[in-house]
């Protein structure tokens, strides 16, 4: 369950395992260095991230982040890692207790993961390009290689992202997905619907990733899915606000060490 606090939501099921998995609200401020907002002073985003870490009692953590470019690239942060700022990386995994993994959003879908057997965590940025490129599949493969992760041991959180009612897409968008995954597949049939008033397709990125997770071996009882919608004014939304939108963070870290 996603529990709302003043400045963020946290996932209760992750908290029960000693994992902070949070999604920041708009009133926590813009979190992304690569998305400067008009009139915002330099360094504001870093201050906002530090303030969030302080609020979560995680101020000692080393922040890890990337200039995200809608890839399916997932980076391992291990004991030999000395670089913490990346480019062209859209997800991280780690078993280190001294880092906080940051990813950034304004409608795209965060995928939070915790390997309950091997004590490893991750967070992956899955907008429609990440979903199309199957970042979830790649992330699980990276975890298997790094930690011996098995899907049945994964606790996974999906959200917070934009809901289908506000996610209108073009015919080419639909055709590209249908060609890759199969027009009659469960993935496509359950993830797209036509708005009867406009005749336009609407995409359900959350359902797409839920079905993908099940196909990849995640147990349904280990899936935690948010019903919140980033179209709501309490979140940043690129579709609602356009280029002036800031970015939320989806951050994951171990609680104590």
Which residues fall in each region the model found?
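Active-site microenvironment for binding and transforming phosphate-containing groups
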Residues: 1-257
């Amino acid at each position: 369950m996603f529990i709302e606090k003043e400045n963020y939501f946290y996932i209760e099921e992750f908290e029960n395992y000693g994992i902070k998995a949070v999604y920041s609200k708009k009133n926590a401020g813009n979190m992304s260095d690569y998305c400067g907002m008009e009139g915002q002073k330099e360094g504001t985003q870093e201050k906002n991230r530090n303030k969030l870490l302080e609020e979560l009692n995680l101020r000692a953590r080393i922040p890890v982040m990337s200039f995200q470019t809608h890839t399916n690239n997932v980076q391992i942060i291990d004991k030999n890692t000395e670089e913490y700022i990346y480019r062209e990386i859209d997800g991280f995994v780690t078993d280190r207790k001294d880092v906080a993994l940051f990813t950034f959003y304004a409608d795209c879908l965060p995928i939070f993961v915790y390997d309950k057997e091997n004590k490893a965590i991750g967070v992956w940025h899955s907008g429609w390009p990440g979903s199309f490129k199957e970042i979830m599949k790649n992330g699980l493969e990276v975890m298997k290689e790094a930690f011996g992760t098995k899907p049945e041991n994964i606790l996974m959180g999906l959200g917070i992202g934009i809901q289908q009612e506000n996610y209108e897409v073009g015919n080419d968008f639909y055709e590209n997905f249908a060609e890759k995954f199969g027009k009659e597949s469960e993935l496509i049939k359950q993830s797209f619907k036509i708005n009867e008033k406009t005749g336009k397709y609407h995409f359900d990125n959350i359902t797409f990733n839920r079905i993908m997770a099940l196909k990849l071996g995640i147990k349904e009882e280990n899936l935690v899915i948010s019903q919140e919608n980033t179209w709501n004014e309490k979140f940043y939304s690129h579709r609602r606000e356009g280029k002036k939108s800031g970015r939320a963070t989806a951050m994951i870290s171990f609680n104590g060490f």
